[in-house]
């Protein structure tokens, strides 16, 4: 449901109404010496981007982009005034406010003091609702403009934000459900929240506040499970949060239970969205609940079949039917191996996954202060963080897709200032015989974390607070004693480019649906890939950093179209130590994309005859330094006609 706010400006030009989309990613505004002449809007609807343009494209262009979908526009402002010789008002300037508390530069004309020129206006939803579309009037210029904002549907149960009036208002809207919640703290307050919503087969993230300490997360088994209750406390700011689900599970308490308590809960409803206020912390939090769908009626029982005539006696020589085959035994559950270390801190338990792809280790003054684990589950990437990150940063250990961790050497010690032993160092060993460097300070007391059966490490548990006190693990039986249980048909082609940035690896999927390439001043600033796994579209992480220069998209006609080759260039640029990728071009079984970026430097091509590309890996920092691919054989079905 949406709220159409009246347009501001003049009454000439032709009326337009873009309607309602899922969100706005980018706005480009053009101006001449008098007024705003042109607006171009990039909308998103069901995972696809659509462009709408109004006015006449002339004069100087300026762009404003949001960190979509995490960030969204919550207010549309600007100014309008009568233009000499035109006989009516025109839009003189535009500006936008977002859910991150940001305000765009003034796009258009300003006074000598830097304010919008003309009569100012600000259009926003009552509760910080998301901008979903524009309407207005235009011709040779932009005569008038108004927004469509998200509005609470009457069928929803809306809980107004509880807390203070600081920060900026935001409203994520209503989705199909909630997949995951991440909560970060800064001292005794909740400073950051990130919600991963479900919309059809897609995951839509929205983040609010300022990330300080490493966030903790609560994962919902969507669509089989939903959140039924949100409980928290307010002590000036949001101080704690707790969630209860339809399966009777209750999350840990995120934060400190101090201040006044609130509960969002409605019988036969489920949580589908959040709203609130935030700046440096979460000032207030509200929620949207939707009614549960009516249960599907049980089918009417089929009529009983007529009794069959009695069979004639079988001849004595009739063969005895073979016994039914014995069903294959269910896979053995993972083995939970006890945590090694001290007794301090708070218990955490990530559970078991399909694979551990990467481990990040952060050092403190006395030992391991922080760990982050990157898991794979049903083709999806999930992360868990524990401890507290320090200014000393993190190091990482990456596990190849056809390898797995078999054991960990854990060094522990009694350190002054801590009531029990803490973990001071970690060393990882894999099935392929790889041994990592020691992460931290090794001590005389070294313990080995393994299950004694050659199992594959698939999850972690332990104890942590400001440091890592203890670490344990889940080990799953391997399906083959000599070969890791990963697809043997995929090939990982070496990444090309410079040696800067941090390594990343999206892994192997069924195919690629869409590619987003962000431009920088001198090279490719970031890449994001949308993959397909089974019946789901999975949006990968952003690798690199978004800039104001915008994003270009290459969308495939999946599943009939697939990528066969990636070409590009990398080069040394001023001010960056390692070479960066300057251009990318994608070839499919049907066509070739435009070059994204500048074709300058060393040329490379990533392909394998008879293979298609189903995943990407590489290195990135503020720019993309390297890119490589995962490829699998192309299987074609043939039909013989006689």
Swiss-Prot record:
GO terms for biological process: cell adhesion; defense response; flower development; response to wounding. GO terms for cellular component: thioglucosidase complex. Induction: Not regulated by wounding, dehydration stress, methyl jasmonate, salicylic acid or abscisic acid treatments. GO terms for molecular function: carbohydrate binding; thioglucosidase binding. Pfam families: Jacalin (PF01419). Residues 479-490 have a biased composition (Low complexity). It comes from the Eukaryota. Residues 2-151, 156-291, 334-477, 490-633 form the Jacalin-type lectin domain. Expressed in flowers. Detected mainly in ovules and styles of immature flowers, but also in pistils, styles, stamens, petals and embryos. Not detected in leaves. Residues 296-334 have a biased composition (Pro residues). Residues 296-338, 479-499 are annotated as: Disordered. Keywords: Lectin, Repeat. Belongs to the jacalin lectin family. This is Myrosinase-binding protein 2.
